[in-house]
UniProtKB/Swiss-Prot annotation:
Stretches assigned to the GIY-YIG domain: 14-95
Protein name: Structure-specific endonuclease subunit slx1
Subunit details: Forms a heterodimer with slx4.
Root EC class: hydrolase
Encoding gene (name): slx1
Length: 364
């Protein structure tokens, strides 16, 4: 590889999301971001250290994760979206008329607020969902590979009710889905602490350690190491993997390779958006299957920059010997609590000092 391609940085994160928590009494909400929703929910509910101070206030636990927004290309991108979602009265990502309405609410709230009260206007759940819908459609975030996943059916129903009234719809590449978080059927004598610390399996099962693209990475590395001469699927010229940024079709049965610049131009041409610089999706020049640009870029960054991450991903993790067995059980994937744990820092408690309780009265 040439010196120009030696990039001393980490690959794109395996996973990063923004989330909306709701407290047990359903009068308080929290917006945050994390690379590991299951671990973060445990922090908020006190099963591990690192949760924001505000979320540990008396009477607020247990917290439930009602929905997440996924697809952020970096931690800083998620923090940017998180701040905008928390501060719709101040962010420039929201249209001026919407922002001014939020400011009016803020000024009304300040008149009766004590000096120690927080500076954000009170918001209902409906308002938070409206703000989320606004953010998903603004130019700043409209080309990010974002998706929304709901865990609380009643929150999803309120979202559906809201978008049914909207004149504009989100772009088709944004998927909105409901995967209900089933609460356990615990016996009456189960301690309240156990109930508080419960993390739904649907949240635990979210892939946060590159395990979802492991087969794709294996296929790409095998394709590039087979010694065969390959031509770019777009320009048809020879592909030099040591000097070029090369993208591989993620389709299991397709071995198409392309220069990143060539495939980018092809995808943008298919989209016919002259103002766009980064594609969202397109079709493989060989198998013609639809491909998400973000999937290929994540695989490329992991393959080129993730030496340590790849070692962890492909290393067989040993467990302790079980009783009456002669062999060790193994775990195919790395411990998600170890991978990228340094990215999941304690939340900034000053943010929560400026968050209000829910206002049950919907605001126009």
């Amino acid at each position: 590889m040439t010196d120009g391609l030696k990039i001393d940085s980490r690959p794109l994160p395996a996973f990063y999301c923004c989330y909306l928590l709701r407290s047990k009494n359903r009068k308080a909400f929290y917006i945050g971001s994390t690379p590991n929703p299951a671990r973060r929910l445990g922090q908020h509910n006190g099963s591990s250290k690192g949760g924001a101070k505000r979320t540990s206030m008396q009477g607020k636990r247990p917290w439930e994760m009602t929905c997440i927004v996924t697809g952020f290309p970096s931690r800083f991108a998620a923090l940017q979206f998180e701040w905008a979602w928390q501060n719709t009265h101040a962010t420039r990502h929201i249209e001026r008329d919407v922002r001014e309405a939020r400011k009016d609410e803020l000024e009304k709230g300040r008149k009766n607020a004590s000096p120690v009260k927080r500076s954000r206007p009170p918001m209902s759940l409906e308002a938070r969902l409206k703000n989320l819908h606004h953010l998903l459609g603004v130019g700043s975030f409209s080309r990010w590979p974002l998706h929304v996943r709901f865990f609380a059916p009643d929150v999803f129903s309120q979202w559906e009710k809201h978008i049914s009234k909207m004149n504009t719809s989100l772009r088709k590449s944004i998927t909105i889905r409901l995967t209900p978080a089933e609460l356990p059927k615990l016996a009456p004598d189960v301690s309240s602490e156990m109930r508080t610390h419960f993390i739904p399996e649907v949240i635990r099962a979210i892939p946060v350690a590159y395990e979802d693209i492991k087969p794709y990475v294996e296929k790409s590395m095998s394709t590039l190491r087979d010694g065969k001469t390959r031509d770019c699927g777009v320009c048809k010229k020879d592909v030099n993997v040591d000097r070029s940024l090369v993208l591989i079709c993620p389709n299991e049965t397709c071995c198409s390779v392309s220069h990143m610049s060539c495939l980018s131009q092809r995808f943008l041409a298919e989209e016919a958006n002259k103002e766009a610089f980064i594609p969202i999706e397109g079709t493989c020049p060989s198998c013609h299957s639809p491909i998400k640009w973000s999937d290929m870029i994540k695989e490329l960054s992991l393959r080129m920059r993730g030496e340590d991450e790849l070692k962890t991903l492909f290393k067989t993790k040993r467990k302790k010997k079980q009783v009456d067995t002669t062999e060790d059980d193994t775990d195919e994937y790395p411990d998600i609590d170890d991978l990228n744990a340094d990215l999941d820092e304690d939340l900034d408690e000053t943010w929560m000092e400026n968050v209000n309780e829910e206002d049950d009265k919907p605001r126009s």
